[in-house]
Amino acid sequence: MNTLECLAVAVALAMDAFAVAIATGIRLREVSPRQTFRLAFHFGLFQALMPVAGWTLGLTVRGYIEQWDHWLAFGLLLYIGVRMMREAFEETEENDDRCDPTRGLTLIMLAVATSIDALAVGLSLSVLGIDIVTPAIVIGVVCLLFTATGLHLGRMLSRAESLGRRAALAGGVVLIGIGLRILYEHGVFDTAATLARSVLG
């Protein structure tokens, strides 16, 4: 894998993290350097480690992982997305500090959900016999940069007076949309449509 190919893969993998970071910035509205570091570091770290984990596993458990990885990502994003949408309608100041997506379990869940595709990439590179060290480093660094950028872009969007509460609501919708896209890309809806036709037909 040459440098250009490695960068292309890294950018593609960073898109979900970028979108989630924007949604997180919208949710927070005010972003501190510490929050930026936590989110970018964890997203970048998980994005770098997942390909290594996938590469290490190789063909041994590939079929098993591919059966449930997309459902795991969808479940995590759905849970956090619904939570953000619910809190968009709660107006107390206490709520502003109750769910900081850059801390605790929520941060880990987001990091895992946005790095599932990187696990699959690691599996693929293992099959192709490609060394994982350089791709993992590039993938992690690119994700870190995209996450930091997305977080502050979301913060700027949330400050627009015309957005208000709708911006926070949109953040939750974005997360759920990403989860649905993951299911779509794994053919879940095609399978469901086929089953429906067979039952109705």
Curated annotation (Swiss-Prot):
**Localisation:** Cell inner membrane
Q: Which residues cross the membrane?
A: 6-26, 39-59, 105-125, 127-147, 169-189
Highest taxon of the source?
A: Bacteria
Q: How does it sit in the membrane?
A: Multi-pass membrane protein
Identify the GO cellular component terms for this protein.
Answer: plasma membrane
Keyword list (alphabetical) reads: Cell inner membrane, Cell membrane, Ion transport, Manganese, Membrane, Transmembrane, Transmembrane helix, Transport
- Entry keyword Cell inner membrane: yes
Q: Name one GO molecular function term.
A: manganese ion transmembrane transporter activity
Q: What family is reported?
A: Belongs to the MntP (TC 9.B.29) family.
Q: What does this protein do?
A: Probably functions as a manganese efflux pump.
Q: Which PANTHER family match?
A: MANGANESE EFFLUX PUMP MNTP-RELATED
Q: Which HAMAP family does the record cross-reference, listed alphabetically?
A: MntP_pump
Q: What is this protein called?
A: Putative manganese efflux pump MntP
